[in-house]
From Swiss-Prot:
Family named by the database record: Belongs to the NTE family.
Motif (GXGXXG): 1232-1237
Function of the molecule: Intracellular phospholipase B that catalyzes the double deacylation of phosphatidylcholine (PC) to glycerophosphocholine (GroPCho). Plays an important role in membrane lipid homeostasis. Responsible for the rapid PC turnover in response to inositol, elevated temperatures, or when choline is present in the growth medium.
Membrane topology (Lumenal): 94-115
Keyword set includes Cytoplasm: no
Main enzyme class: hydrolase
Organism phylogeny: Eukaryota, Fungi, Dikarya, Ascomycota, Pezizomycotina
Disordered, as annotated region: 242-265, 303-385, 766-789, 1510-1531
SUPFAM superfamilies: cAMP-binding domain-like, FabD/lysophospholipase-like
UniProt-recorded name of the protein: Lysophospholipase nte1
Activity-regulation annotation: Inhibited by organophosphorus esters.
Keywords tagged on the record: Endoplasmic reticulum, Hydrolase, Lipid degradation, Lipid metabolism, Membrane, Repeat, Transmembrane, Transmembrane helix
Catalyzed reactions per annotation: a 1-acyl-sn-glycero-3-phosphocholine + H2O = sn-glycerol 3-phosphocholine + a fatty acid + H(+)
Length: 1531
């Protein structure tokens, strides 16, 4: 061992082993094995050497022998077992028992000493604390920065589907048929036999280019099949000149719009151009074809008649002094050469006496009819004018026209009366929608339209009999006077209805009465002798001839009706019948000893007599008794002398007219819902038991007639309201007028003050557009003081008010007010609809009267207006096309889309029912600025430019009216904020959303997947719509209702046509229609719900899987462009964070937003049949109930029930959704102002307590924070708690001191500010908020404002609250966002764009010091500091550098604030918070109480002024339905 160099020599054994381990290891191993095999002591002796060696080396390997023999292998295995395994065991034992304890003893016996100073210890401590704080700061306290990225949801791209191929691309016969079918669509749906009857006599005619056609000589329905025809009208200034010269000259000249004579006088003017598939006839000319043989007025020769106009009398020009037309030469007025409609058709011409007709009481009819007829053939000057005079057609190219002659319409009227009545009803409806609505609401032709109603009173005035005047009327008035004294003035103005003892009985259905009558007839026939049956059959033959309500008791045996009618026999006697002493009337043999009821007053019920008499006059007025009464008198005496008055004779055609016309009697069969076949018309007109159908009608109407009293000044009908029914004036006067503004508007209109038009939903809207507010308040409403009425005419006793509107289901163009105390008989609209459906003569009479009273101006407008029907997705015109017409939406919805230079589609606007589009381009003769396409199947009125030019020359007032409309639209465009016109992504959705929320008429409710309770959802939504007061009401449709209406046509092509017309009528009748898709996904009704909807609500269960459902796939396959919104149903008022994003992530087609609705529902439908209760089933159900109860208490979910809620039902989720669909949402806009925004919490609480619902919330800066708190839960209590907690954090100086950093970008890092907002909102997203919410920010990277309505709440609220210099901007998709108040601190414009109707704007911003500065042209900073501290200085302090920067930043915000204050519908609120600073968060309670007190005072002030938009005012409007539910007098 050499120790000098520190090297220790190893033992020989170890040294040799280390030198040659390969030879030493096997030897030592074999020696150890042999020693172990011989004796244990030898193993103990060599323990120390082996342990030292084995502790450093692993177990030695064993080299296997050469595989020569099997014995060698076996030996090697035994050697391995006895050598290696013991060595390993020995190593483990020695290490754990000796080596390891030795190491531990050595370690613990060692001592270490560290010596360091305080500086080192301090540095080490700081390092440790810094490491821990860094770990906590960046690992635990910044969880907001590690949230998964959730970018804002992008607006879906607009899809324009390819155009529907035009029909003119089809070859040959298909093109011809398509053009013809498109032209006769104006008739509505036609059944196959009706279609064949109409077209079997159709003729075609070829016109060469330049050939003219006098339409006034064409007696038929003309349509263009192929070619182009121009329609000309003779100028009014040149009407009296001859027309032959004009026609000859016009045929050879070019197609200018105006032709001029050499002397400068005008000739013919171009009205319109008719292309393929369009009609050359107007709606009025079609009506004239159907009503040639209909009388204008029922003949009443008694003294009580209000007019002497009879069916055989001509109406001269002096009969209608206000008529714009000459009535004496109109074929529809002149009745002298027509036969009485009641003449029997079975009689032949030879049976008739060859005598000319006599006219009793008038001499205005020319005596020579044949001479007049002959002269008409040869003299153009003396020929009778048609319904379309001075109308000439000229073919521009070789044209093929089709003509359906007038004889086809006459035969159709005779063979298919119910189909004729339906066609007339369809045309009357379209006449109102197309011609009347356009002339009244769009062109301002009030005098022409309202003059028709005024002149109509000439036909409908019939006085009550004299016996009901005097003392009888006085006794009736006494009953009302007693009740009026008992009631208050407010109740009396709604009307007092006389008690009707039979009014409460529910009338039985017509089918039930028919079955009952048939059964009773069989029973009577089986019991009576043959002679009685023969007598009844003879009577039945007489009744088949015709029945008049005035002759009921003279032809009907009362005993057949049972004891009740025998008891009521005196009361059923018609007073009008008794007072007519006609020599043709004989006493009825059925009622022996009948005497006049007026001589036995003690046995009469005068109320019933009044009702019978009023009903008699009303039925005469609507034309139900004219032909039938005369016909009954004639047929009752076949052997007697026939009065010439009762039998007219046509000397030209040598045959009797109306000999067996279907309208000569009243059709007995009610138009059932399943559409009964017209073949049933050939059956007997009487019921099976011999009962005339008119008796059933009289019984029904007698129960429906109400006698109502209205005091002076009461409003019976309001402008824009659908007529509640017919008012027959018994005593008093009704004043018919229109509301006019006292202050005339200029060309661009005058905007009302902000408080004038606060809540448009509280006022009825005009039928032309939902944006034009009507007046629906009571006469004493303080908000109507700015309007006055202009009286048009008076309705005197005996007159009928509402005839045109009630029979044809029009809306009223006028107000009807009681001029004096008035007593009226009221027949509800439902009864009139029943009459019109069962008795076609009422509609035909109305159509006849309308055609006779039509002004020439309306005729020309009706001729030129084209009724157009387009399919869903069809493009009406493209961008860049020539503007040739103005389009008015009658039904459906249109969307205007502008294509930018980069191909991006931008929605310009959407247009609903009653709105127009294209005036500006037509007036300026420019090209179309955008593409217009139909969102769904749409009906349009096409107003050609040629008609506008023609009207502008002859009626300048029309030009002024349209100019006002265009000027108003231009004003709206000028006043629209520039931000809303831009194409930036953050602002582009404003205009689109605003246009799409207005004037929605149809809403489709579609489930996401099967099992969603859409029926219950639709019913609750409908109930909410009724409660908020939708204009004209709302209704819902499901498959059951549609099948009930269609009946046997439900699954045929006819059913589709019938359904389309039915749906169009419903949309016209109601303000909103809900289509509930309650069928399977592939059913036709589901497809109908999608195609008919302006807006589609996709309803899904929030707790179910958010995958795409089968109904959504079907919706996407339909390629509809309607607006789509998602509705999530929650069982509780709670939405888990991120749930809404999962639903919206895969639904890029949702372009209308989403809604959260709480609704309790059953996941499984109740079984229709109760299941048998077995023991196993009962036990299983009981276990499930117990398990559910346990989970209720053990679940960790916190039940989100509102802790505070105002006592108002209008804050419900369904009411919020209903207001959104109606465009009546209430918005709340909160401005920025730092700690001053705490006052907004108090204002919101005041709004809650006042019961004002809030639907949409928008905020800026601190307003975004407060608004997000309220929108999250829609509750005041959690908002108050979280806001106070956040204010406590912001009031801590130490938190900001610890967050300070080097002011390169800002003074603080923003971490503490981020944590304060994140601790308030967590990971919730804006989509999960219960109320719709948005906040605005300023994008300094792109220099624009952005509005955020999706994404993490804390990020965008933090960005909206980021003051420049204090907090760094927040990064969002590469852009830097700062406080939104720099551009717009009060976002009223954006809220208005979202569809909010009433907006509460709370401004808490600071007010700048506007003191004039006079410090000169230069300024010393030292002088400014001294002046600031000098109390004796008179110079104002100049602003500091920071104040100048702040004012510079808020320059644009001040302009937007001033515009927001003047926005219509905006209620501007500014609490007195000026003494408080931006960072005074420590004064939370003080500022909160100040805002609460201000809010209560402000709302109370609005309530006193009548300007508070409370839903209760809508309920008051419902009470104006005066006669629908009148107050009964206790008599």
């Amino acid at each position: 061992m050499a120790t000098g160099d520190g090297i220790i020599a190893a033992p020989p054994s170890l040294e040799s082993s280390s030198l040659d381990p390969l030879h030493v290891l096997p030897a030592s191993s074999s020696t150890a094995a042999r020693s172990l095999a011989t004796s244990i002591p030898a193993l103990t002796a060599s323990f120390s050497v082996v342990s030292g060696f084995s502790s450093h080396l692993p177990p030695p390997p064993v080299t296997p022998p050469a595989p020569s023999t099997m014995v060698g292998w076996i030996g090697w295995i035994f050697s391995f077992i006895f050598q290696v395994i013991p060595s390993v065991l020995y190593w483990i034992v020695t290490f754990t028992t000796i080596t390891l304890p030795t190491w531990l003893f050595t370690l613990f016996s060692m001592s270490l000493t560290f010596t360091m100073n305080f500086t080192t210890l301090l540095l080490i401590a700081l390092a440790v604390v810094s490491t821990i704080s860094w770990f906590i700061r960046y690992r635990f306290l910044n969880m907001y920065s590690r949230l998964p990225p959730e970018p804002q949801r992008k607006e879906p791209q607009l899809d324009l589907f390819p155009d529907v191929p035009d029909s003119d691309t089809k070859p040959g016969l298909a093109n011809y048929l398509d053009e013809f079918l498109s032209a006769i669509k104006v008739f509505g749906y036609l059944e196959r036999p009706v279609f064949h009857e109409l077209t079997r006599t159709m003729q075609t005619r070829k016109l060469i280019a330049g050939e003219t056609l006098l339409l006034e000589e064409e007696k038929g329905f003309c349509l263009v099949v192929d070619g182009l025809v121009q329609i000309f009208v003779k100028s009014m200034r040149d009407r009296k000149s001859g027309s032959d010269e004009e026609l000859n000259r016009m045929a050879g000249e070019s197609s200018d719009e105006d032709d001029h004579r050499p002397d400068g006088r005008q000739g013919y003017q171009l009205l319109t151009e008719v292309k393929n598939g369009a009609s050359m006839s107007s709606l009025f000319s079609i009506l004239s074809l159907f009503t040639e043989d209909v009388q204008l007025r029922y003949a009443d020769s008694s003294a009580s008649s209000a007019s002497s106009i009879g069916p055989g009398l001509a109406i001269g020009p002096d009969s209608f002094p206000a008529s714009p037309r000459e009535m004496d030469d109109s074929p529809h007025v002149y009745q002298g050469d027509r036969l009485d409609p009641a003449s029997h058709r079975n009689s032949t011409a030879e049976d008739l006496p060859a005598v000319p007709p006599l006219n009793l009481g008038e001499s205005q009819v020319p005596p020579a009819h044949s001479a007049r007829s002959e002269s008409r053939k040869y003299s153009g000057k003396t020929r009778r004018k048609s319904v379309h005079p001075d109308i000439v057609a000229r073919a521009m190219v070789d044209t093929t026209i089709a003509i359906i002659p007038a004889s086809a319409f006459r035969r159709l009227t005779r063979v298919y009366p119910k189909a004729t009545a339906h066609i007339v009803q369809v045309i009357l409806t379209r006449l109102q929608r197309v011609t009347f609505a356009t002339a009244h609401s769009y062109l301002g032709l009030n005098n022409e339209v309202l003059g028709i109603e005024k002149q109509m009173t000439k036909f409908t005035t019939y006085d009550l009999p004299n016996e009901l005047r005097g003392s009888a009327l006085d006794r009736l008035k006494d009953k009302f006077i007693k009740e009026r004294d008992r009631l208050g003035q407010e109740e009396v103005t709604k009307g007092i209805a006389l008690h009707n003892p039979y009014g409460g009985r529910r009338p039985r259905s017509s089918s039930f009465r028919r079955k009952e009558a048939a059964l009773q007839a069989k029973m009577v026939a089986s019991k009576r002798p043959v002679s009685m049956v023969a007598q009844d059959s003879a009577l039945s033959d007489r009744e088949n001839s015709g029945v008049s309500p005035g002759d009921l008791l003279s032809t009907i045996q009362l005993s057949r009706f049972g004891p009740r009618y025998e008891h009521l026999a005196p009361r059923l006697l018609s007073p009008l019948t008794e007072k007519e002493h006609s020599p043709l009337r004989s006493p009825s043999p059925m009622i022996p000893g009948r005497a006049s009821p007026f001589h036995r007053k003690e046995s009469l019920d005068e109320d019933a007599l009044f009702r019978e008499s009023i009903l008699e006059c009303i039925m005469k007025g609507i034309g139900l008794t004219g032909s039938t009464n005369d016909f009954l008198r004639k047929s009752s005496h076949p052997s007697g002398d026939v009065s010439p008055k009762l039998l007219s004779y046509d000397s030209r055609r040598q045959k009797a007219v109306f000999s067996n016309n279907a309208f000569g009697f009243i059709d007995p069969y009610e138009g059932s819902a399943d559409g009964e076949s017209e073949s049933m018309m050939s059956m007997s007109v009487t019921s099976a038991g011999g009962t005339s159908p008119i008796v059933n009608l009289r019984e029904e109407l007698r129960n429906d007639i109400e006698i109502v009293y209205f005091p002076q000044g009461s409003v019976l009908v309001e402008q824009g309201e659908r007529h509640p029914g017919l008012y027959y004036v018994v005593d008093g006067f009704l004043d018919v007028g229109i509301p006019v503004d006292d202050k005339e508007e200029d060309l661009v209109g005058s905007s009302r003050p902000a408080h004038e038009e606060l809540f448009p939903m509280l006022r009825r809207t005009n039928t032309s557009s939902s944006r034009v507010s009507g007046s629906a308040a009571a006469a004493n409403d303080p908000r109507r003081k700015k309007q006055s009425r202009r009286s048009l005419y008076l309705i005197k006793p005996g007159g009928i008010q509402g005839y045109v509107g009630a029979v044809a289901s029009y809306r009223s163009y006028t107000d009807v007010v009681a001029k004096t105390d008035v007593y009226v008989g009221f027949l509800p609209r439902a009864s009139l609809e029943r009459i019109a459906e069962r008795y076609p003569l009422a509609l035909l009479t109305l159509a006849k009267r309308l055609t006779s009273l039509l002004p020439r101006l309306l005729l020309h407008i009706d001729f030129a207006l084209e009724w157009v029907q387009v399919s869903a997705g069809q493009v009406i015109y493209h961008q860049g096309d020539e503007s040739d017409a103005i389009y008015l939406a009658l039904n459906g919805r249109l969307r205007s889309v502008h294509e930018g230079p980069n191909g991006k589609m931008t929605v310009v606007g959407e247009y609903g029912q009653g709105e127009s589009v294209g005036e500006l381009e037509v007036m300026t003769e420019s090209t179309r600025p955008a593409t217009l396409h139909a969102i769904r199947d749409t009906e349009l009125a096409k107003f050609p430019r040629t008609l506008f030019n023609s009207l502008a020359q002859e009626h300048p007032g029309i030009t002024i009216q349209v100019s006002k409309l265009i000027a108003q639209r231009m004003r709206d465009l000028v006043e629209t904020p520039l931000a809303e016109k831009g194409g930036e992504p953050g602002v582009s959705g404003t205009v689109k959303t605003a246009k799409s929320t207005l004037n929605l008429r149809t809403v489709g409710i579609l489930p996401v997947t099967a099992g969603v309770p859409v029926v219950e959802f639709g019913n609750r939504l409908l109930q909410a719509l009724h409660q908020i007061g939708v204009t004209n009401g709302a209704t819902s449709l499901n498959q059951a209702a549609i099948l009930n209406h269609l009946g046997r046509h439900a699954f045929s092509k006819m059913g589709k046509l019938k359904l389309s017309q039915y749906l169009a009528d419903l949309e016209e009748k109601y303000g909103m229609v809900l289509y509930i898709a309650d069928t399977s996904v592939n059913s036709p009704w589901t497809q109908t719900c999608i195609t008919q909807a302006d807006c589609i609500l996709l309803v899904g269960l929030a707790e179910s899987t958010p995958s795409i459902g089968e109904y959504e796939r079907f919706l996407l396959g339909m390629k509809t462009t309607a607006r789509k919104e998602l509705v999530l149903l929650h069982g509780e008022r709670y939405c888990p964070p991120g749930l809404t994003r999962q639903w919206l992530k895969n639904r890029v087609w949702i372009n209308g937003g989403h809604h959260h609705v709480q609704m309790a529902f059953r996941l499984t439908a109740e079984p229709s049949h109760p299941q048998t209760k077995r023991f196993g089933t009962v036990l299983k159900q009981r276990v499930q109930v117990i398990q559910a109860e346990i989970q209720k208490y053990t679940s960790r979910r916190i039940r989100q029930s509102p802790l505070y809620s105002a006592q108002t039902p209008f804050k419900g989720d369904f009411h919020r959704l209903a207001r959104r669909l109606c465009g009546r949402s209430v918005g709340l806009v909160l401005g920025g102002g730092g700690a001053r925004g705490i006052a907004q919490v108090g204002v919101i609480k005041a709004l809650e307590e006042a019961g004002i619902p809030i639907d949409v919330i928008g905020g800026t800066s601190i307003g975004s924070f407060i608004g997000a708190l309220y929108a999250r839960d829609a509750d005041v209590v959690p908002m108050y708690g979280r806001a106070k907690k956040f204010a406590g954090r912001m009031g801590s100086i130490w938190r900001f001191a610890l967050d300070l950093t080097y002011p390169t970008v800002s003074y603080t890092t923003g971490h503490e500010f981020n944590r304060g907002i994140f601790k308030t909102f967590g990971d919730s997203q804006i989509e999960d908020f219960w109320l719709e919410f948005y906040c605005n920010t300023t994008n300094i990277s792109r220099s624009r404002a952005e509005y955020h309505s999706s994404g993490y709440t804390w990020r965008y609220v933090r960005a909206s609250m980021s003051l420049a210099g204090l907090i760094p901007p927040i990064c969002d998709e590469g852009s830097m966002l700062l406080d939104g108040g720099y551009i717009d601190n009060l976002t009223v414009d954006h809220m208005k764009g979202l569809g909010a109707d009433v907006i509460f704007a709370v401004d808490v911003g600071s007010i700048d010091d506007n003191t004039p500065q006079v410090y000169g042209d230069s300024l010393s900073g030292f002088w400014a500091v001294v002046n600031r501290w000098n109390p004796f200085s008179s110079c104002p302090n100049p602003p500091t550098l920071s104040e100048i920067q702040a004012r510079l930043a808020y320059v644009s915000s001040i302009e937007n604030l001033e515009r927001a204050k003047n926005t219509p519908g905006c209620l501007y609120m500014r609490p007195p918070i000026d003494p408080y600073g931006t960072l005074d968060f420590a004064k939370f309670d003080e500022i909160y109480q100040l805002g609460y007190a201000y809010g209560k005072n402000y709302l109370e002030k609005l309530k006193r002024e009548g300007s508070l938009p409370l839903p209760e005012e809508t309920e008051e409007k419902k009470k104006l339905q005066r006669t629908l539910a009148p107050r009964r007098a206790s008599i």
